[in-house]
């Protein structure tokens, strides 16, 4: 099933509930940098996020160095952002919160 690209107003409404996520200038992707206390916590976050991404069949672009994980989300097939991006972002927030207490 193809996800429909969200209009900018819908994107901004979704983004309002996600602290620290930034919208790129073209409104085609969102990104965030997560900082953890060490590599194990960062990798644990990535592992949990990867399981969710696989369940959603929606995969992030990400980069990890030690305790930092940079994430960018968009839906290539839709040419921008869809509800899948925000579902994955919310799941990532929950995974991060379990490690950032």
From Swiss-Prot:
Whether DNA repair counts among this entry's keywords is: no
Q: Which InterPro entries match?
A: PCD_sf, Pterin_deHydtase
A Pfam family (short name) is Pterin_4a
GO function terms (MF aspect) = 4-alpha-hydroxytetrahydrobiopterin dehydratase activity
User: Catalytic activity, per the record?
Assistant: (4aS,6R)-4a-hydroxy-L-erythro-5,6,7,8-tetrahydrobiopterin = (6R)-L-erythro-6,7-dihydrobiopterin + H2O
Q: What keywords appear on the UniProt entry?
A: Lyase
Q: Which GO terms describe its biological process?
A: tetrahydrobiopterin biosynthetic process
Give the first-level EC class, as a single word.
lyase
EC annotation from Swiss-Prot or TrEMBL: 4.2.1.96
Q: Which domain of life is it from?
A: Bacteria
The family classification in the record reads: Belongs to the pterin-4-alpha-carbinolamine dehydratase family.
Q: What is this protein called?
A: Putative pterin-4-alpha-carbinolamine dehydratase
